[in-house]
Amino acid sequence: MRVCLVRHGETTWSLSGQHTGSTDLGLTAHGEEESRALAPRLRTLAFTQVLVSPRLRARQTCALAGFGSQSRIDADLSEWDYGHYEGLRSEDIRRQSPGWNIWCDGCPGGESPADVSARADRLIARLSTMHDTMQGTVAVFSHGHFGAALAVRWIGLALVEGQHFALHTASVGLLGTALHHPDRRTIELWNACRSPPSSPTPDL
């Protein structure tokens, strides 16, 4: 089994660098365009199942890419709960808390790194159970921070390593296993975009 990880398209807050967890923003016009552009690439993968975060931006991306009717909402794909840091930029947070790093410190009133790691592990366990009953590729439409968390936990790294796995909007990653070593998980593709992104590199 492979997992195709798709980050949602651009929103006004992804463009401005504001942390967007539970705030239910829709896509910008550019976000809609880049989500539609996912369709030709994703159609070739013949997904056996499509899971999507409950957030509007992820659901819109999934629908515009052509998979809305076959998708199922999975709350474990939600973005990191930023708690009191919702809507703030990293530079704003560091003025309050110098040296803050979400991957080490988490968010007061929201999720800790241990919380997010446990959620990613829970999702991976369920995906592995699916693998026992079906082959093929599962698509997951999610978010920047949680997508990075899922990738590092997939290959057995500590959650803090997620800070090195930036995901641009409407980008694609493929999580799989080594060809002759099915017990060895791999990252086959990461942060693949149709064209150079208009948004800055995400601040992880």
Q: What are these language model-derived features?
A:
Residues V52-S53, A118, F141-S142:
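Short beta-strand scaffold positions
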Residues A65-R122, P202-L204:
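Phosphate-handling substructures
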